[in-house]
Amino acid sequence: GTQRKGSGVIIDDNHILTIGYIVVEAENINITLSDGKKIPGELAGYDSTTGFGILKTAIPLKLDALEFGDSDKLTKEEMLFIIPHLNEGKPSAANMVSRRPFVGWWEYFLDKPIYTFPMNHSWAGAPLINQYGKILGIGSLYVTEAYVEGMLSPGNLFIPINDLKPIFDDLIQNGRRTKDIKPYMGLSSQINSGKISVTRVNENGPAAKAGIMEKDIILSINNKKIKDMEDFYKTVWSSGGPGSKLNFE
């Protein structure tokens, strides 16, 4: 649609942390505070590798900000809280039930995302906080199998806050990461009968220019056989930065 909305969390006097897909490519950004006050904002930084987005407010917020926690130390025993904007949904308690990898068909991979249960319906951009009010993650997705693959357990996926820390200054100062940039292929894919099947090729992208087409099957890269989606992405990303040439079979 033409409009998107979601939640975010104040991290300093002029910045709000959210999920990038809510705000990326937006022509206008309007921020509604918890008291109903509306202020204009702009996209200060976006990282397609993790999915984080940071907004800059037009005026200082002069409100309490939340601090970053340590998502690497999160345990399944901790009580967590999902806090969406009050106009978007209700806060809810949750538990971390898994830290397994997540692979997205849109050239996206998270090594240790936080899967929570039960589900909060207003997850997009909502902070996941611990009992001390520290941010541990930002809401990204609804998932049907939070506990383990193959077990129906509707929950949410949060991007760990520790994934933001190495690139935070870059996003604030430069609007994007300037180090460890992953190459972009310009295709969507999925596992089909144990093989990587191309489901879409973006017009004028690197894959299209290389002659890759929808419904192609990718067997190997640089003579290395590909076993699954995770292996596919990691092989591409470890073969060189943007501009590197790869041999696809």
Model-flagged regions — what are they?
Residues 63, 82, 89, 113, ...:
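C-terminal cap/linker of serine protease catalytic domains
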Residues 37-38, 42, 169-176, 210-213, ...:
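PDZ-domain C-terminal substructure recognizer with occasional recognition of PDZ-binding tails
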Residues 13-17, 132-136, 207-230:
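Conserved PDZ fold ligand-binding element
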Residues 12, 18-24, 84, 97-100, ...:
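Short beta->alpha transition motifs characteristic of CBS
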Residues 8-10, 41-43, 96-98, 128, ...:
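Conserved hydrophobic positions within beta-strands
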Residues 7, 69-73, 126-127, 206-217, ...:
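A short glycine-leucine-enriched loop at secondary-structure breakpoints
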Residues 9, 120-139:
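Catalytic nucleophile loop of clan PA
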Residues 3-5, 10-91, 113, 122, ...:
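Conserved active-site neighborhood of the chymotrypsin/trypsin-like protease fold
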